[in-house]
Each structure stands twice: as C-alpha cells, then as structure tokens.
Amino acid sequence: MRLNCFRIFVHIQKPTQIFKPFYRSLSSEASDKYHFVNGHKMSKAPTDMAPWPAFIEERIKLWDKLKAEYDAEIAAKESEPIQITLPDGKIHEGKTWRTTPFEIAERISKGLAEAAVIAKVNGAVWDLDRPFEGNAKLELLKFDDDEAKQVFWHSSAHVLGEAMERYCGGHLCYGPPIQEGFYYDMWHENRTICPDDFPKIDQIVKAAVKDKQKFERLEMTKEDLLEMFKYNEFKVRIITEKIHTPKTTVYRCGPLIDLCRGPHVRHTGKVKAMAITKNSSSYWEGKADAESLQRLYGISFPDSKQLKEWQKLQEEAAKRDHRKLGKEHDLFFFHQLSPGSAFWYPKGAHIYNKLVDFIRKQYRRRGFTEVITPNMYNKKLWETSGHWQHYSEDMFKIEVEKEEFGLKPMNCPGHCLMFGHMPHTYNELPFRFADFGVLHRNEMSGALTGLTRVRRFQQDDAHIFCRQDQISEEIKQCLDFLEYAYEKVFGFTFKLNLSTRPEGFLGNIETWDKAEADLTNALNASGRKWVLNPGDGAFYGPKIDITIQDALKRNFQCATIQLDFQLPNQFDLSYFDEKGEKQRPVMIHRAVLGSVERMTAILTESYGGKWPFWLSPRQCKIITVHESVRDYANDVKKQIFEAGFEIEYEENCGDTMNKQVRKAQLAQFNFILVIGAKEKENGTVNVRTRDNAVRGEVALDKLISKFRRFADEYVADTEKSEEWA
C-alpha cells in the first residue's frame, strides 16, 4: 500500500492535485475549548480552521504507532552506569538511556534547569530530555548563547508552522532559524496570507504556547516518512531527493509533526514572547522556475521584556535605514537603468574612498602588496577554477570574437594566475596579494536590497600564498588585523566561528587535520572566545567566519578567513623548497570589510549618519557673524581644505546665526566654526560640536593639528571634552 501511495506522488505534477482529497472533516470529537485528536487534547483558538485538515489526524495516528514502538525499544535497552562531566570538572553519575541533561540540570539547581534552552553533549547540541547514550561532557546553554538562540528560534519556527497549518491548512515546506529570528515557507492552493492575518495566527501561537506542548523526537524509516507526509508533495521531494540514510528524525509539538534534525527546547511554553514580523513570497528552494510559496518571518524570546527591547531597536533601525539616510544625506542612489549598481554622490564617494584608504594604509603596515587584475576573463579560467561549473548562473557573461568571457565575481582565480606566472622559492613566501578590483554578480532583481545586496561592488580582497608551516602565523596576523579594524576603529564587537571539514571535502584528511589544528591554535592564541561549527567548512578548506555586532545589536557576517588547498592544485601552483623540489603553496582567502558597499550600509546604520571625523563627509562648517569677516572666513576655509579636510562655507546665507548652527548640527557636521570680529582679530575660530557643546576659541593652527590627529588616529568621539582640554 505504501508503494502505491509513493507511485501516485511521483506522477503528480502540481500540488493542487494533492490538496483537496485530504480536506475532510476529522472524525475526532471536539469541545468548545479543546481539540481532541486521537486521544490528544489541545487548546482551541478562536481563529482555528473548523475542521482542521484531515492530514493532521492521519499524521498523528502514524506517529502514535511508531512512537510507542520506539519507546518500547528504548525501554528494552540495557542501562549502564556512566559519568557526566561538567565544564568545571565536576562529575555526575547517570545511566545510559535513562538519565537526561535536564535531570542533571535539576541536580545543580532548579533555576538553571528552567533557564537552560538546550544541552551540548560531547560538543553537539542535544535535547534536554533526550537520554545520554554513553559517558558525556555536558554543557547547559542559556538563551544568551548563539547556538541556544538558533535552537530557540528553530523551535519557534515549529510553533509558527503549527499555527499556519491550523489557520489555513497550507502545506509547510522549510522553516529554519536565521540570523535573527526564523521563517516558515508554505504552499497554499488558493489562499494568500497578508498582515491582516498576523493577529489571527498569533492567537493560535498563544494557544500552542499555553499548552506547553512537548517537543518529541522520533527516528523514522524512509518508507514510513513517505507514508506520513504523502499529503505534501514538497516533503515527499525532500524525502526522496535529500535523505540518503536508512532513517532520519522528525519532531512533534502538539498537532505538528515535521522533518527535522533538531534539537529543540523542551516544550512550546518556553517561547513566552513571539511576534510575526513580515511576510513575503519565495520560490521552492530559491529556484525562480519552481512553485511560488508564501513566507512568514518571526522573532521570539524567553520573555516579553526582551521582545519589547527588540521592537524598540527595530524602530530605531527603521529611522537609520541606510537607504533613507543615503537619500537624506546625499550619499548615493540607485537607478532602474542599472539595477544593483550604486551611483555615489561626492559625499558618499568620500566615505567609500576613506574606507579603502584605511585598508590601504593597513596593507603597507602589514606586508600586503596591492595588485590590479582584469575585470573580464575567458571562460577557460573559470573552468579551471571550477566557477563555471558551480557558479556560472551568478556570473555576467559576454561573447567576444565567438569566445565566451565572464565578468569576475571574485579575485582569487586571477591572483592564482599572477602567482603562477613567475617561479618562486620558499624564502619568498608568503606572498600577500591585495585587490580592490570591481566585481559583478548576477543577483536576481528581487534579491537586490540597497547597498547590502548589489550586482556591482568592490571588496578589500586579499589572498595569501604561503607554506604549510606559515599558516598559523598568517592566521594570527589576520585576526590581529580584524581586531584592530572592528573593535578599535569601527567600535564593533565580533565573534569567531571555526568551520571544519564537511562531508563532501576535497583533498586528504591529513592535510585537513593539520590545517584545522593550525586554525585552532591561532584562535586559541588570540585569547578570544570562539565556537566550533563541525562540518560547516567550504569543500576546499576550513574557514573562520567572523560575525560583527553593531550599535543596534544586530549581527552581520562581513569578514572571512578561509584556507584553500584546491585552487593551488587546480592552477598547478608551486614554489621551490630548500632542496630545489617543487611544493604546493597553501592559499588563504581574507577580507576585512568584505564588500565596501555592504560595510558602508552597516556603518551608516550603526552610526545613524553621525560619522566619526575621519570618515565624515561633513567634517566642519564655517558660520560668520557678520559679512565683514568673510575674507577671513574664506582664508580659514582655504587653509583647512588644503590641509586635507572637508569644509563648507555659505557666504550669502540669509538665515540667522542660530538657525545656521541648528541646520549644520542636523546635517551632522562634526564641528561648527563660528567666526566674528574677535576671532578674526585673534586668528582663531569658535568651535561648537554637532551635539551643541561649545569648545570655545581655538587657534587655527592648533585646530588643524587636532584635526590631523583625529584623522590619523581614527579617533571615535572627537567631540568629547577631553579631546579639547
């Protein structure tokens, strides 16, 4: 019978053909307050469908049967004594297949058990109610831990998915956690979700949270999975195309059962505060020629206070949106005749160039050599690098004299050509090539978002070619560069993640192990906390991912440090060792800013348009008290401009002095220089800040000297009183 069901599905072409047959009344009895499904009691919400889709009951029936078999199998397992070691070295006794992380947490304190979101067992996240299977090292993670947040938001996505099914009976697709929150994709034959539906879905969310539905884990065979999800073509596709193991896991909370690796929070009651934030359309697996889906986004927290704080930050973020500030401050704009490519006004270009200049100065101090490479290459280069096979859909292609060329989406293959063009010896390494070349990526028009997702951009791209024994020191220097730029100059905090060998890796295990050990040693030597992401590395080498947090507590991934063993092989790169024998160099991909466009967007929003002096396109403005001092004002302007600073002066402004000062402050000029007869006589200017702090008379030569220090040392808050003492 199961085979017949499966054969029916593989021949079905459209989801519409599988939707209606399962829309029948549930046979389960119900009351005014509760749903009863196969003996399970669940709170009703006023906005629930009546009746629920029949697939919910059929799914639960199969679950109950298989779960009973699974529980009996676990109960029959022989339990053996084990030791559970905590991070502080304390050891707790337990038993295999019986003792759970939650029980250990309760032994320590009830408060810890209640606050814990998820467990980490032998380095892998683990359900709090899932029994240990052997001796274990145990960590208990709270919501402030990044991995715990991802689990919490993943569980919240399941709660949202349950509400979506109960509200309109759609077929769920993918529902992952994202950098901040989560989403769920749903297909529906004839229903469109809009913001007016959010409060109604939220009522069902609240009912699910009130029930404290347990998150339960079950391993199922592929055959049983096809039977359970036969009503949903999208799940059938995942099962048939993505699952290559005899068994996989599903999780249940209340009426929802879904394909999922887990782990999850203990029960839905942990999600005390949730908000649906927006909706959008999407395509199945991101393919434009596939079915159109509906996507709901959400955010959640363990308490309502955190949700309110987050909502306040979102209100502030809306005010600081870089697209809004870019327009208000005359920084950049976009035009339909060149989508995804920014037009930079002079003030925006000033910021852009200052960021590039900052990196250039660091390159000189840190041993990087800047190179210039072509924008366009014959497709043979991209075939050698592998990009033509795996990335060509995202490239802009051009035919030149009957041969196909591609605009470069990254610099690394060109740098490989440069390294391979001349012979090298071991004592010449490392080579550190840096490149600000223009890159192009053929992003879909619907994905373009201001400066954060563009088609034309520049990166502070660098590639280091080094020996195996130089990896650790090079990584250490890269981390030092990041720390200086992010923390000391931009004022960000950042986190480090080490992503190691994935399943489909290229190369030999010994080389990978050595590289991962080098990265681990460099991270440990940095003295910073870092997180291991097993199996999340690139196929060509392990990497360090860097996530920054801005003034609005938002996280962004900009920088990266990646080891690459494959491109040197593909381009047959070599150097001569001390014995005169050819050896293969290691390649390190490295960026600090990442895309200059994207970093400009992040900084615009983080600073809220109040640029630090060294980056500011509006460093100072002259305001004169009387027309008799205009000649002196123009002389001041000339000296400050020739010293290399941005200064403005309107001779014939008809506004009062107070109004001019206020306008300059709102325009975020760092300093307002007021000039009257006294200042002209003394050769000074009267300095005010954009925050209306009066710093008094300052001699012009002394002011220029201060400006130089502010710019050269990247002083963050030049308006502070101690800077003017």
Curated annotation (Swiss-Prot):
Q: Which GO terms describe its biological process?
A: determination of adult lifespan; threonyl-tRNA aminoacylation
Q: Which residues form the TGS domain?
A: 80-142
- What Enzyme Commission number(s) does the record list for this chain? 6.1.1.3
Keyword ATP-binding in record: yes
Subcellular localization: Cytoplasm
Q: Please, which domain of life does this record's source organism belong to?
A: Eukaryota
**GO CC list:** mitochondrion
Q: What class of enzyme is it?
A: ligase
Chief localization class?
Answer: cytoplasm
Report which reactions are catalysed by this protein. tRNA(Thr) + L-threonine + ATP = L-threonyl-tRNA(Thr) + AMP + diphosphate + H(+)
UniProt key word Protein biosynthesis: yes
Q: Name one GO molecular function term.
A: threonine-tRNA ligase activity
The entry sums up its family as follows: Belongs to the class-II aminoacyl-tRNA synthetase family.
Q: What HAMAP family does the record point to?
A: Thr_tRNA_synth
Protein's recorded name: Threonine--tRNA ligase, cytoplasmic
Q: Which gene encodes it?
A: tars-1
